[in-house]
Swiss-Prot record:
One of its GO terms (cellular component) is cytosol. Binds 2 magnesium ions per subunit. The lineage of its organism: Bacteria, Pseudomonadati, Pseudomonadota, Gammaproteobacteria, Aeromonadales. NADP(+) binds at residues 45-48, 68, 76, 78, 108-110, 158. Its EC number is 1.1.1.86. Mg(2+) 1 binds at residues 217, 221. The gene is ilvC. One of its GO terms (biological process) is L-valine biosynthetic process. It is an enzyme of class 1 (oxidoreductase). This is Ketol-acid reductoisomerase (NADP(+)). Its cofactor is Mg(2+). Involved in the biosynthesis of branched-chain amino acids (BCAA). Catalyzes an alkyl-migration followed by a ketol-acid reduction of (S)-2-acetolactate (S2AL) to yield (R)-2,3-dihydroxy-isovalerate. In the isomerase reaction, S2AL is rearranged via a Mg-dependent methyl migration to produce 3-hydroxy-3-methyl-2-ketobutyrate (HMKB). In the reductase reaction, this 2-ketoacid undergoes a metal-dependent reduction by NADPH to yield (R)-2,3-dihydroxy-isovalerate. It comes from Aeromonas hydrophila subsp. hydrophila (strain ATCC 7966 / DSM 30187 / BCRC 13018 / CCUG 14551 / JCM 1027 / KCTC 2358 / NCIMB 9240 / NCTC 8049).
């Protein structure tokens, strides 16, 4: 199979990268009625598979799970989760032939085998759904001409898809129809109904393309969402301990610091996050973030270029063929890092202390979010897509670090995201260790500086204006208007 994106001419590539429209609430007035009375069969019962299924069933749809025969006879975790939640479970041969909509919600590396298995079993005119377009775009999966191919991609982990639905809300979602597979022109109606059934229409839906979703998703998760959190955690912990900070305190400051800092980001963007700092600290964080952006821009651009060209996918799929040798090796290295093995800290850290003692962490978040956004937009991805794949998802990923450090983050994210995270962090850590961390001053990380520092009013004004007028702040203000009911997610400590 050939990389689908690379088979397109430049005009087609730009058109698909730039496909992005924020859909109006009234476009979902029909809810999920298009799928009422239809048979929806989900393949895969992981975080997205189970939680989307629960939401869709609660929305009145007929949901069942198709699993491999071995998973059923051996009562594996997927079978256990589906049956524990009262779903009908059967083999591919039992359920796929009568399905009107088959949702392939398995991990990326399984998509090709799953599609090859289920496609001959699917009835004429059925639909096939994805929540990530890697198989279609990067692997170039060819789908039977009579099958409609759609995507509904919630912009958060599966657990949050369920929790927000239970609150009567939802999570922002991208939907798309594969232009090569919409024989009856029904794709958009199916995608809208699926998104509505998961609750996505309550939080905002972008009409996108498979191409735009894949390229922006890969970029976000490799850089700011996972790669920067991994690199920043390892570097900041080592710096604190090297300068005499109690390892237990350092571990807690980093583990819960990302979550606390990005909670402000979630509620009011970069501006609110920066406003949580004192004026001298805000100026310093702005200065550090500009330094980071200059230093790291080539690395961000390299990752975007490799994603666009298909180099990243080629490298990762080569590792699949080697039984994930690189992935497992990098995972083991992370598990042995000093931060991952830091002792527990019994004391309390006040919320403001995370900001006051984590000025460089704020700078890393600001620089990473802005760089990821700028790099995606410069590559033809629209601002709305770039926002969701950078700033919006960051608090959700930071929350996983707060639970069980980097181990939890790398367990929750996909193997594709984990592989990309290591690629980025493995380059970012030595770069920042040599050229950035030695430039830090007293008060940038750890104990904050004493009060009484002077502030240049004009410098503060310029920093505030630059932050608030960044394009991600402007589009973020609009998109957050559709998410006014966002709950706090910080687990704190």
């Amino acid at each position: 199979m050939a990389n689908y994106f690379n088979t397109l001419n430049l005009r087609q590539q730009l058109a698909q990268l730039g496909k992005c429209r924020f859909m109006q609430r009234e476009e979902f007035a029909d809810g999920c009625n298009v799928l009422k009375g239809k048979k929806v069969v989900i393949v895969g019962c992981g975080a997205q598979g189970l939680n989307q299924g629960l939401n869709m069933r609660d929305s009145g749809l007929d949901i069942s799970y198709a699993l491999r025969k071995a998973a059923i006879t051996e009562k594996r975790a997927s079978w256990q989760k589906a049956t524990d939640n009262g779903f009908a479970v059967g083999t591919y041969e039992e359920l796929i032939p009568t399905a009107d909509l088959v949702l392939n919600l398995t991990p990326d590396k399984q998509h090709s085998d799953v599609v090859k298995t289920v496609m001959p079993l699917m009835k004429q005119g059925a639909a096939l759904g994805y929540s990530h377009g890697f198989n279609v775009v990067e692997e170039g999966q060819q789908i039977r001409a009579d099958i409609t191919v759609v995507m509904v991609a919630p912009k958060c982990p599966g657990t949050e898809v369920r929790e927000e639905y239970k609150r009567g809300f939802g999570v922002p979602t991208l939907i798309a129809v594969h232009p090569e597979n919409d024989p009856k022109g029904e794709g958009m109606a199916i995608a809208k109904a699926w998104a509505s059934a998961t609750g996505g229409d309550r939080a905002g839906v972008l009409e996108s393309s498979f191409v735009a979703e894949v390229k922006s998703d890969l970029m976000g998760e490799q850089t700011i969402l996972c790669g920067m959190l991994q690199a920043g955690s390892l570097l900041c912990y080592d710096k604190l301990v090297a300068e005499g900070t109690d390892p237990a305190y350092a571990g807690k400051l980093i583990q819960f610091g990302w979550e606390t800092i990005t909670e402000a980001l979630k509620q009011g963007g970069i501006s609110l996050m920066m406003d949580r700092l004192s004026n001298p600290a805000k100026l310093r964080a702005f200065e550090l973030s500009e330094q980071l952006k200059t230093l790291m821009r080539p690395l961000f651009e390299k990752h975007m270029d490799d994603i666009i060209a298909g180099e990243f996918s080629r490298g990762m799929m080569a590792d699949w063929a080697e039984d994930d040798a690189k992935l497992f090796g990098w995972r083991e290295e992370t598990g042995k890092s000093a931060f991952e093995n830091a002792p527990a800290f019994a004391g309390k850290i006040a919320e403001q202390e995370y900001f006051d003692n984590g000025v460089v962490m704020v700078a890393m978040v600001k620089a990473g979010v802005e760089l990821a956004f700028e790099t995606m937009v410069a590559s033809g991805i629209y601002e709305e897509s770039a926002y969701y794949e950078s700033l919006h998802e960051l608090p959700l990923i930071a929350n996983t670090v707060a639970r069980k450090r980097l181990y939890e983050m790398n367990v929750v994210i996909s193997d594709t995201a984990e592989y990309g995270n290591y690629l980025f962090a493995n380059a970012a850590v030595p770069l920042l260790r040599e050229h950035f961390m030695p430039t830090l001053k007293a008060g940038d990380l750890g104990a904050s500086k004493a009060e009484g520092q002077s502030v240049d009013n004009l410098a503060l004004l310029a920093a505030n204006e630059a932050t608030r007028n960044h394009p991600i702040e402007k589009i973020g203000q609009v998109l957050r208007g559709y998410m006014k009911d966002m709950k706090r997610i910080a687990v704190g400590g």
